[in-house]
From Swiss-Prot:
Gene Ontology terms, MF aspect: isomerase activity
UniProt name for this protein: Probable tautomerase LL0574
UniProt-listed InterPro entries: 4-OT-like_dom, Tautomerase/MIF_sf
Similarity comment: Belongs to the 4-oxalocrotonate tautomerase family.
Coiled coil (UniProt feature): none
Superkingdom of origin organism: Bacteria
SUPFAM superfamilies: Tautomerase/MIF (SSF55331)
Keywords: Isomerase
Keyword hit for Disulfide bond: no
Active site: P2 (proton acceptor)
Amino acid sequence: MPYVHVELFEGRTVEQKAIIAKEITESISKHAGAPTSAIHVIFNDLPEGMLYQGGEMKKKK
């Protein structure tokens, strides 16, 4: 039972997340052979100031 964690800056709608989750689920099922009912997609919305790369804060675009 695969668990896929997706971390994005805040601001995506429920509809956008549903599309992303569906496409991730279909891809994992196709390439890993897992049944879609066993695949879990978990979203973590990051507020600005919570993601740093190379010591520099990443900003929403």
